[in-house]
């Protein structure tokens, strides 16, 4: 009952001091909004690919300046090095805005080509279909949830045919959750890598001439580490891969999947800047500190008026403990109100 009376009295005080209320609540709310937005962004950035079940065993093959290679390279490395359990070359960001047709609808789609083991290799969620069979045949395709809704609406897309750029038809065998929070870019359609030649003649299972389109992912056997053998891999590459034969590329670098997004060596996938994230986190902390100091300064500015009120209440019989609890309830209420407003502001911005 006393707490309710305290809150009621505090609301009267805020009503009498509208300028103080607006500056204090609005200032703290806006500051908390920025802190919330920065926190959401930094958490998202720092959690990229952390959901990958085998992330500690997956590496991307790179050279000094790029996380790129030829389509067959991953398979050649698997044949030679027993440390490798399986491989999954991925071609992304090379076939964006391709025209597709289905159910008399014509749309643009982002295509991605990968090894048939894609869903056993990575931990991307399949909403329908068997991860061991969805890419079993050359003309199989897995469609993203968002693109399935755009193209087929409420109809079940599995078993439906999609025509791509007048030349190729594929059958939808599965629906996957949208790829996000990963170094691997979002894609509308995931196709088998064996079919990439139909869209680009320089790419193929036996074609090395296009060296900048593919990301070769290697999964090591438990406990195995191929990184000490990178010099040997570079020497081996000279036997069959022209950039190494011509000494345009000299080194082989194996980048762990968990570090790929923030790697200074970029490729065809998504990437981030860890220094920017750290700077942004620092800015968020500074904003929070300034907000707290601003709140304290405004509270101190009202100290004289509040001291008279507290003295009057002390004379009327309130104990020190009751006055302390009153101030705590007031401060907590103001902070909670500001946080709720800051959260609503942040939701409005993100929406």
Question: Which residues are covered by each model-predicted region?
Answer:
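Membrane-helix entry/capping segments
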Residues: 1-20, 52, 224-227, 232-284, ...
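Generic structural signal for small/hydrophobic residues in well-ordered secondary structure
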Residues: 14, 24, 45, 61, ...
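Membrane-proximal extracellular/periplasmic loop immediately following the first transmembrane helix
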Residues: 38-97, 112, 205-217, 230-232, ...
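Intracellular coupling helices
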Residues: 4-23, 27, 293-334
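Small-residue-rich transmembrane alpha-helices
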Residues: 37, 253, 332-351
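Selective detector of the "anchor" transmembrane alpha-helix that sits immediately C-terminal
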Residues: 277-297
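Mid-to-C-terminal secondary-structure elements
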Residues: 112-128, 141-272
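Short, strongly hydrophobic transmembrane alpha-helices
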Residues: 17-44
């Amino acid at each position: 009952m006393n707490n309710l009376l305290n809150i009621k009295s505090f609301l009267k005080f805020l009503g009498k001091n509208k300028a103080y209320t607006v500056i204090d609540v609005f200032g703290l709310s806006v500051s908390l909004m920025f802190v919330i937005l920065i926190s959401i962004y930094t958490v998202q950035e720092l959690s990229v690919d952390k959901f990958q079940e085998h992330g500690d065993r997956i590496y991307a093959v790179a050279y000094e300046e790029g996380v790129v290679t030829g389509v067959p390279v991953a398979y050649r490395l698997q044949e030679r090095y027993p440390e490798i359990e399986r491989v999954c070359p991925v071609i992304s960001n090379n076939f964006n805005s391709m025209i597709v047709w289905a159910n008399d609808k014509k749309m643009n789609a982002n295509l991605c080509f990968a090894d048939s083991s894609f869903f056993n290799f990575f931990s991307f969620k399949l909403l329908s279909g068997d991860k061991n069979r969805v890419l079993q045949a050359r003309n199989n395709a897995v469609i993203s949830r968002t693109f399935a809704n755009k193209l087929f609406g409420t109809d079940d897309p599995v078993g439906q045919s999609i025509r791509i750029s007048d030349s190729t038809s594929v059958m939808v065998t599965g629906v996957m959750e949208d790829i996000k929070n990963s170094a691997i870019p979002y894609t509308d359609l995931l196709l088998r890598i064996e079919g990439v030649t139909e869209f680009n003649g320089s790419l193929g299972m036996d074609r090395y001439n296009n060296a900048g389109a593919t990301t070769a992912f290697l999964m090591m056997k438990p406990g195995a580490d191929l990184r000490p053998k990178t010099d040997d891999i570079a020497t081996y590459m000279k036997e069959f891969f022209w950039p190494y034969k011509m000494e345009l590329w000299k080194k082989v670098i194996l980048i762990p999947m968990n570090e790929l997004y923030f790697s200074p060596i970029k490729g065809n996938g998504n990437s981030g800047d860890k220094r920017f994230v750290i700077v942004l986190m620092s800015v968020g902390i500074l904003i929070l500190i300034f907000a707290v100091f601003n709140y304290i300064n405004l509270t101190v500015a009202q100290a004289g008026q509040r001291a008279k009120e507290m003295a009057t209440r002390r004379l009327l019989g309130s104990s020190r403990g009751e006055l302390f609890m009153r101030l705590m309830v007031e401060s907590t209420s103001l902070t909670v109100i500001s946080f709720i407003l800051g959260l609503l502001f942040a939701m409005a911005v993100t929406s």
